[in-house]
Every structure is written in C-alpha cells, then in structure tokens.
Amino acid sequence: MEKNKKIDFSIGIFDDISENIKKRVKKEADNCEIYGVGVYSDEIVKNEYKTSPIRSEEERMNLVKNLEGVNFIFLVDSIDVNEIKKIVEKACKGVLKNRN
C-alpha cells in the first residue's frame, strides 16, 4: 500500500442506514484520507450472527457505496482477522491504483 496514506474502514451488516450511521461514517471518513466500508456476506450474517439479513448483500453494498466519504466498498466473507486483512488490502490497492 502507498505510504503515508491514512486508511480506515468499518465492517457491518448494513441492512439499514440510519442518520447515526451516516454521521458516524462521515466523521470517520473525515479523519482519514481513504475510507472503506465492508459488508458482511449473507452467509456470514446467517452462520456467524445467527440471523437473516433483511436485504441481500448486493443491496446492502449499494446502500453503503453512496454514503458520503466512502472511497471503496468490499464484501467480507470471513470472520478470520487475517482473511479480512487480505480482503481490505486488496480493496485498498484498487483504490490507490485508481488515484495515481
């Protein structure tokens, strides 16, 4: 990844985007140069959170991609920290490549 770029992200289910979520995302995005949002896959929500998402993962990704301050989105299909790190790094590389 490009040095000296502060990159931050949030991960969640994001079935509903409340005003509080919009404010939180904007605040977090304002404190970094590149901000991303990860959306848990339908499978992770069902198997790990023991619930069913209201919206499909595609619909949820469409909701978060238009939030103010979001530079990239990514699907999270693992709860393993090392796998999530790889997913985020891959998504960040795409954003950094497009910025240059």
Residue spans of the language-model regions?
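Nucleotidyltransferase catalytic core that binds NTPs
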Residues: M1-N100
